[in-house]
Design a protein with these regions (language model features):
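A short SAM/SAH-binding and catalytic strip from SAM-dependent methyltransferases
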Residues: 213-227
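Conserved beta-strand signature within the Rossmann-like core of class I S-adenosyl-L-methionine
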Residues: 241-249
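A short glycine-rich, Lys/Arg-flanked "PGG" loop and its adjoining helix->strand segment in the class I
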Residues: 228-240
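Class I SAM-dependent methyltransferase SAM/SAH-binding core
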Residues: 151-153, 158-204
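A short acidic, Gly/Pro-enriched loop at the edge of an enzyme's catalytic core
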Residues: 205-215
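Helix-start (N-cap) detector for alpha-helical repeat units in TPR-like alpha-solenoids
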Residues: 14-15, 48-49, 82-83
Length: 308
């Protein structure tokens, strides 16, 4: 159990108890870990990382009310929510579903950037960009057009895994991501004509109408609860005939759920409704497994939609 963001307490004894608690948690001793985290926050009451870890372990022990109190303490001490405590409150049904804190997403991916490709491709058998590209090519073939794009946007480009998949299809390729360290990794691959570090919704709002003929988002929409506002923002920057292609995780029920891994899963009906709200025409909505988790396939969907 490792928090995506760690900030020392400034108290050596508290930091040591936190470290020992992490070791116990990783060995599966949640009760022992919780005791150490409780000692850490007693020594350093403003120790945000220890409060967060305490919330995680109490949740694992099914001590819901204590976990909720710990996560609320995290938010009080760090309103930017770099640890993602608000997401845990959503999971514990102590807070309604909403957007992910940008500072949490940034710190999470800054932490993983250097090992991201290996962890995702080798560890989780990630193949989202390739499957998404195949769907784009198939949609173009069905429409009797070439899979060739004047100006493509890789939304949430990360380290450039998506860029590698669509670079052969794009005259110009723009990448945008919230994480500076992920963008550094993408820059080293020399796939993009331009890379931008920015909040994705903010970036879309700053663009003129109808500037892209492809918006490509592999493994990005899993970080948004309601897809409709994002789909609307993407539709505005698409030129007539342009395509929006994205992948999501899905589930058999209705609406949106927040999974154990703190990623949103969207029902097929929610995806259809979001595309309709954006005024786009759905071309493809196929079942797909873009990644594994614990050697088990994660159910997903691949969507391709067009602006008429």
């Amino acid at each position: 159990m490792t928090a995506p963001f760690f900030q020392t307490s400034g108290n050596l004894l508290a930091d040591r108890r936190y470290t020992f608690g992490q070791e116990l948690a990783e060995r599966g001793d949640a009760a022992g870990a919780a005791d150490l985290f409780a000692q850490a926050v007693e020594l350093a009451p403003a120790f945000v990382s220890a409060w967060f870890a305490l919330g995680e372990t109490r949740a694992r022990l099914d001590e819901k009310s204590v976990a909720i109190d710990a996560f609320r303490k995290v938010l009080a001490l760090d309103p930017a929510d770099r640890h993602g405590a608000g997401l845990h409150l959503m999971r514990l049904q102590a807070k309604g579903l909403g957007g992910m804190p940008p500072d949490y997403v940034r710190s999470l991916f800054d932490q993983y950037a250097a090992r991201f490709d290996t962890a995702l491709v080798e560890g989780l058998a990630y193949r989202g960009p390739e499957l998404l590209r195949v769907s784009v090519e198939a949609a173009c073939a069905a429409a009797g057009r070439r899979a060739s794009f004047r100006m493509a946007l890789d939304l949430g480009c990360g380290t450039g895994l998506g860029g590698a998949a669509i670079r052969p299809l794009a005259g110009r390729l723009i990448g945008v991501d919230l994480s500076p360290k992920m963008v550094e990794q993408a820059k080293a691959k020399k796939l993009y004509d331009r890379l931008v570090v920015e909040n994705l919704v903010t970036f879309l709002k700053l663009q003129s109408d109808a500037v892209f003929d492809l918006v490509f988002a592999a493994d990005v929409f899993a970080y948004f609860a309601d897809l409709a506002p994002l789909a609307v923002a993407c539709a505005r920057v698409l030129e007539p005939g342009g395509l929006l292609a994205f992948s999501v995780e899905t589930h058999a029920g209705d609406g949106v759920i927040l999974g154990e891994k703190l990623r949103f899963a969207h029902a097929r009906t929610h995806v259809r409704a979001a595309i309709a709200a954006a005024g786009l025409r759905l071309l493809t909505l196929d079942d797909a497994v873009t990644r594994n988790d614990g050697n088990m396939p994660v159910p997903g969907l691949i969507a391709v939609a067009a602006r008429d």
